[in-house]
């Protein structure tokens, strides 16, 4: 299994180095749900601004303030503790008057707005996130500038970031130990983290092997293609290859890679053979996913940061702004720009 730091670079290994997150204000994330509150219903959507506290801690504090069980407060995704983040929490308060949430105060957290909503906010139910990052002590400015131009055109590999695998790869190591034993794992959080790490590592390995190919973004017979921004996909045939390639080149379609698990992977013929060969040495992790009935899925092979723009504050400091769809990692963009001082594992997804 290829370690995250050794995964193939689309634009070659960066020449420069720099600091990511010298302070929390250098990593700003604004959640984009893709919809507005309904204005009615038994739930309350609460938009918060936080710095120095993690999402679960704030959700539990909100539940305590509202005098409801912690499970009645949900969110679409975890946001980093050591960053400035805006996100939505959702509290189920059936039959209750609208509370005055301006009175909800904890250190490092502020309520920006709140409104009634009809449905629970579920994990993953967001459109994406807008990022503002500041990279400091950057060397080789010309190389970074050229890479920004290239990323704007060609994107980056859509790798799962190092934080998916835990500090020191602990989640992936846990998955491997589990795969090698028949002992049940009863801790639900560990099960979730370890299975997610296993499937993500296999996906990264498939993308890693494909990006090594000079023609990696050429449609192969049997590829599973996805409409940009959509979850559904279809299988490419040789007869359609020229037209499908045109649509891939125009970023209307995305070539996907497998998130292995039980059931059909989605690819056929040449594409399926390639994916199977890419992870042929990872039988233990594949067997674990089958044993635990984790359903196979697809994920775009490339990631195109949207609305990408940048501003050099001076020769060694650059501010980046971009938007990424849900499930994508800002650190997978940054790794194509600079070699960061430190690691990514402490940065929440």
From Swiss-Prot:
Catalytic residues (positions): 80 (nucleophile)
Pfam entry (one): TruD
The enzyme's E.C. designation: 5.4.99.27
CDD domains: PseudoU_synth_EcTruD
Isomerase found in the keyword field: yes
Annotated positions binding substrate: 27, 129, 329
Family assignment from sequence similarity: Belongs to the pseudouridine synthase TruD family.
Function: Responsible for synthesis of pseudouridine from uracil-13 in transfer RNAs.
PANTHER family documented for this protein: TRNA PSEUDOURIDINE SYNTHASE D (PTHR47811:SF1)
Protein name from the UniProt record: tRNA pseudouridine synthase D
Organism the protein comes from: Citrobacter koseri (strain ATCC BAA-895 / CDC 4225-83 / SGSC4696)
């Amino acid at each position: 299994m290829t370690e995250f730091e050794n995964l193939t670079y689309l634009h070659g290994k960066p020449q420069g180095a720099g600091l990511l997150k010298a302070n929390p204000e250098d990593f700003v994330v604004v959640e984009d749900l893709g919809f507005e509150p309904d204005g009615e219903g038994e739930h309350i959507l609460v938009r918060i601004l936080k710095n120095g506290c993690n999402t679960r801690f704030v959700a539990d504090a909100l539940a305590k303030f509202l005098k409801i069980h912690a499970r009645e407060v949900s969110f679409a995704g975890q946001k980093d503790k050591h960053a400035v983040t805006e996100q939505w929490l959702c509290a189920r308060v059936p039959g209750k008057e609208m509370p005055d949430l301006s009175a909800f105060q904890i250190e490092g957290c502020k309520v920006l707005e709140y409104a009634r909503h009809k449905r629970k906010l579920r994990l993953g139910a967001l459109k994406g996130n807008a990022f503002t990052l500041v990279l400091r002590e950057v060397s080789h400015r010309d190389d970074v500038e050229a890479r920004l131009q290239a990323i704007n055109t060609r994107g980056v590999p859509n790798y799962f970031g190092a934080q998916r695998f835990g500090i020191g790869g602990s989640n992936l190591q846990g998955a491997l130990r589990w795969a090698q034993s028949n002992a049940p794992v009863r801790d639900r959080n560990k099960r979730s983290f370890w299975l997610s790490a296993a499937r993500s590592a296999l996906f990264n390995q498939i993308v890693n092997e494909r990006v090594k190919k000079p023609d990696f973004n050429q449609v192969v017979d049997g590829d599973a293609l996805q409409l940009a921004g959509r979850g559904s996909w279809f299988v490419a045939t040789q007869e359609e290859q020229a037209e499908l390639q045109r649509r891939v080149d125009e970023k209307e379609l995305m070539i996907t890679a497998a998130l292995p698990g039980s059931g059909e992977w989605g690819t056929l013929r040449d594409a399926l053979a390639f994916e199977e060969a890419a992870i042929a040495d990872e039988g233990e992790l594949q067997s674990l996913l089958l044993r635990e009935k984790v359903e196979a899925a697809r994920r775009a092979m490339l990631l195109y940061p949207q609305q990408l723009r940048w501003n050099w504050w001076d020769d060694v400091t650059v501010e980046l702004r971009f938007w990424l769809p849900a499930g994508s990692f800002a650190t997978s963009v940054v790794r194509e720009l600079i070699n960061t001082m430190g690691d990514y594992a402490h940065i929440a997804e």
